[in-house]
Amino acid sequence: MLTTTLLTLTLASLSQLTIYTAEDAIRDKDGLNAATQYMDAICVNIRPECRSELAPIVAAIRYAENGGKGKEYGILHPKVKPTYRSQAGWCAATVQKNYDRWVKAGKKGDFISFLGAKYAPIGADNDPKGLNRHWVKNVKTYSKKFVW
C-alpha cells in the first residue's frame, strides 16, 4: 500500500514538472526558424563539452529577457545586428566567455549569478525600471526547465 501511494505521489509530481529540450523551448516560443538559428548560434559559439550546461542557460535568457524583434536576448551592443541569429549568437558567445571567466576565477558562487552581474547588472543605466534585479532568479528558474 505504501509503495502504491508513493508511486502515485511521484507520478502526480512528475505530471506537474515540464522539462523541454532547450531547442524545443525556443521553437515553442519563437518558431522553427528561430530554433534553427538558436541551434546554429549554440554550435558556433559554445564548445561541445559545455553545451549541456550552457545551451539551456541561453534558452533561459531568451525567456527571461523576452525581448521584441531584434532584441530577443536583450543584447544591446551597438555592433549587434537586429536579427534573431545575431541576438542568439551574441548571447551564446557572452555566456561561453563568462563561463570561461568564472572557471578561471575558481568557480566562486554559482555561474548564473556571476553571469547576471555582467549580462544584466543591477543599477545599469539602461535599466531605469530596475528590472535587472529579477534577472538571476528568472534565468535560474527557466534554466531548470530546459535540458540539452
Regions found by a protein language model. Name each.
Residues 50-69:
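Short, functionally critical alpha-helical segments immediately adjacent to catalytic or ligand/cofactor-binding
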Residues 71-77:
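Acidic/histidine-rich, surface-exposed loop or edge segments in extracytoplasmic proteins
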Residues 34-35, 67-71:
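Short amphipathic alpha-helical segments, especially helix-boundary/capping motifs
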Residues 2-50, 78-148:
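Non-catalytic cell-wall polysaccharide-engagement segments
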